């Protein structure tokens, strides 16, 4: 978990770092858009939302609405909160479908109890570990965030927070405050042996503790194992998935693989997978 030489959190408060120039990158830079979309896709997988029905989700640190676009594509509704006016302006210019709120997650999420079916956050939570003024106490701000988030979720819902911890001490600080607020769960690490593609997802449960999903490895998903491949390959993949004949062998295999990525128990594939049963008399 080696820290980079120059982390954005060390440059100052997020509302100043994410100015108009930075917001422009999140709208025009195809590389950043691709990475953000893939991490959002993975976060939704880990949420394990009910299939075939829309959910109401909260996006913490929504920025220019890139994650929200994917949420909308999947048929869900969302509300986004961000501390940067420039990023929210970029989201408005892009006509994102979700509702947007300017706010500091370190002061809590201002929603009624049980408002959301789930929560995602991409590359935001680690900002709470830095004190930009004397009154900022990271542990206190983290607890305020997690306790208010716990309240805003329906009982049994999940929150999946992708983050870039600077070191193991910072990750422990975050998980400790989440547990103190009432959450169960843990950290899922995708591609742990890859320096570039390694990703941390804090998977939190607001109900009884369940088995933690397993992290992806290079052998499971080679396309996601490298951040150097930034093309439009994902779009035809989604189209191909929609074109699969329902109940066909390919459709069944794709559905089973998706459930494995969500951490669910799935029976092994065999030569009989996807075969129709013969009628019995």
From Swiss-Prot:
A GO cellular component entry from the record: nucleolus
Ranges of Basic and acidic residues composition bias in the record: 242-256
One Pfam match: Methyltransf_11
Reaction catalyzed: a guanosine in 18S rRNA + S-adenosyl-L-methionine = an N(7)-methylguanosine in 18S rRNA + S-adenosyl-L-homocysteine
Domain of life from the UniProt record: Eukaryota
Compositional bias annotation for Polar residues: 212-231
Subunit field text: Heterodimer with TRMT112; this heterodimerization is necessary for the metabolic stability and activity of the catalytic subunit BUD23. Interacts with GRIP1.
Family: Belongs to the class I-like SAM-binding methyltransferase superfamily. BUD23/WBSCR22 family.
Protein's name in the database: 18S rRNA (guanine-N(7))-methyltransferase
Source species of the chain: Mus musculus
Gene: Bud23
């Amino acid at each position: 978990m080696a820290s980079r030489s120059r982390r954005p959190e060390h440059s100052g408060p997020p509302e100043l770092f994410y100015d108009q120039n930075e917001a422009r990158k999140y709208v025009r830079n195809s590389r950043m858009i691709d990475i953000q979309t893939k991490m959002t896709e993975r976060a939704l997988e880990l949420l394990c939302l009910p299939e075939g029905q829309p959910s109401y989700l909260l996006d913490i640190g929504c920025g220019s609405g890139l994650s929200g676009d994917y949420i909308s594509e999947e048929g869900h509704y969302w509300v986004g909160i961000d501390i940067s006016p420039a990023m929210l302006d970029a989201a408005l210019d892009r006509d994102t479908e979700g509702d947007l709120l300017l706010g500091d997650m370190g002061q809590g999420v201002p929603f009624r109890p049980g408002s959301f079916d789930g929560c995602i956050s991409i590359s935001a939570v680690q900002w709470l570990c830095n004190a930009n003024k004397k009154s900022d106490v990271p542990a206190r701000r983290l607890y305020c965030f997690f306790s208010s988030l716990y309240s805003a979720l329906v009982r049994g819902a999940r929150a999946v927070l992708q983050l870039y911890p600077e070191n193991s001490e910072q990750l422990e600080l975050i998980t400790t405050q989440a547990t103190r607020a009432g959450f169960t769960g843990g950290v899922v690490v995708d591609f742990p042996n890859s320096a570039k593609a390694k990703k941390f997802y804090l998977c939190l449960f607001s109900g009884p503790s369940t088995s933690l999903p397993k992290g992806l490895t290079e052998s499971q998903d080679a396309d996601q194992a490298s951040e150097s491949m930034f093309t439009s390959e994902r779009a035809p993949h989604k189209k191909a998935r929609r074109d699969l004949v329902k109940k066909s062998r390919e459709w069944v295999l794709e559905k089973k693989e998706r459930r494995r990525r969500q951490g669910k128990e799935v029976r092994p594939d065999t030569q009989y997978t996807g075969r129709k049963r013969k009628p019995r008399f």
